[in-house]
C-alpha cells in the first residue's frame, strides 16, 4: 500500500512523495533538505525522482540528492541538469512497483512532462487546482491540447500539482463563471481547509472539470467571459488564451 504526502517547501510549493514503509519516490524536489528530513524521519530509501520541467523551484534539490546517492534514477526532460533518464513523452517509468505513463504536456514549458499511474497524476505546473500555469514557452494551442489530454483522464484521478494556488485560482474562476454553483461550494470547502492549515491538494479530475475554467473552454459562460476579454472566436485555444491573459493581470 502506497501513501502520498505533499511536502511543503518555499512559500507555496510541494514536493510530492509517494512511499511505502521502506522506499519512496519524490516528484519535483525544489529543495533537498526537507526531503532528506522526511526520508530520515521515516527510515525511507529514495528509489527514484521524477521531474516535470526545468524551473529551479522544481529542480533545485536534484544535485544534493543525487550526490548522496550515486546512480539514483532521475527521470525528466533532457535539458534538466541532473536528469539521467531523459524522457520526451510516450514512455513508461516503473518505480515502487507501479508503471507511470509519461505524458508530453507542453504549454508552461515546451518540454513539460506529466506522470500518470492511476490514481495519481503528477502534473507540475501544467494543470493547477482551478487553474493552469503561465505560458512561458508554449502557445495557447499547445496548452489547450495538453489540458484537454489531462481532462480526459478518469474523474477519480488525483491531481497532484506543485503549487498551493487554489484559493487565488478560485477567486479568478469565480470572476470567469460567477454563476457556477460548484465553484461557490468548492471555494467554501477550500477556504476551510486552509484555515486549518491543511493543503487543498490533491484535487480530483472530476472536480477540475466542474470548476477549472481552463478545462471549461466550451462552456457558454466561459466563452462569454473570454469574448469580453478579447477572444476573437469561440475556439478552445482562443478562449484559453483570453482568460489566461486576463488571469495574468487579475
Spans of features found by a protein language model:
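Conserved beta-strand hairpin/beta-sheet module of binuclear metal-dependent hydrolase folds
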Residues: 1-42, 113-128
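Active-site HxH/HxHxD metal-binding segment of metal-dependent hydrolases
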Residues: 10-11, 24, 31-103, 189
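Core dinuclear metal-dependent hydrolase active-site scaffold
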Residues: 17-19, 92-116, 121, 152
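Divalent metal-coordination and catalytic microenvironments
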Residues: 18, 28, 53, 105-108, ...
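Active-site metal-binding loops of divalent metal-dependent hydrolases
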Residues: 29-31, 54, 79, 108-109, ...
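Active-site-adjacent loop/tail segments of enzyme domains
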Residues: 131-157
Amino acid at each position: 500500500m502506497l501513501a502520498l504526502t505533499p511536502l511543503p517547501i518555499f512559500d507555496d510549493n510541494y514536493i510530492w512523495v509517494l512511499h511505502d514503509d521502506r522506499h519512496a519516490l519524490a516528484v519535483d524536489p525544489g529543495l533537498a533538505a526537507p526531503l532528506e528530513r522526511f526520508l530520515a524521519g521515516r527510515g525511507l530509501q529514495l528509489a527514484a525522482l521524477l521531474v516535470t520541467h526545468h524551473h529551479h523551484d522544481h529542480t533545485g534539490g536534484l544535485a544534493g540528492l543525487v550526490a548522496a546517492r550515486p546512480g539514483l534514477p532521475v527521470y525528466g526532460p533532457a535539458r534538466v541538469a541532473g536528469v539521467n533518464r531523459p524522457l520526451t513523452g510516450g514512455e513508461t517509468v516503473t518505480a515502487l512497483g507501479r508503471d507511470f505513463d509519461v505524458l508530453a504536456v507542453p504549454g508552461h514549458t515546451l518540454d513539460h512532462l506529466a506522470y500518470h499511474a492511476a490514481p495519481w497524476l503528477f502534473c507540475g505546473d501544467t494543470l493547477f487546482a482551478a487553474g493552469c500555469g503561465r505560458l512561458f514557452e508554449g502557445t495557447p494551442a499547445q496548452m489547450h491540447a495538453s489540458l484537454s489530454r489531462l481532462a480526459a483522464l478518469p474523474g477519480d484521478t488525483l491531481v497532484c500539482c506543485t503549487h498551493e494556488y487554489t484559493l487565488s485560482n478560485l477567486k479568478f474562476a469565480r470572476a470567469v463563471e460567477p454563476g457556477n454553483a460548484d465553484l461557490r461550494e468548492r471555494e467554501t470547502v477550500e477556504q476551510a481547509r486552509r484555515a486549518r492549515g491543511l493543503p487543498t491538494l490533491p484535487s480530483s479530475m472530476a472536480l477540475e472539470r466542474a470548476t477549472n475554467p481552463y478545462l471549461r473552454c466550451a462552456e457558454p459562460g466561459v466563452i462569454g467571459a473570454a469574448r469580453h476579454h478579447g477572444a476573437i472566436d469561440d475556439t478552445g485555444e482562443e478562449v484559453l488564451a483570453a482568460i489566461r491573459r486576463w488571469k495574468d493581470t487579475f
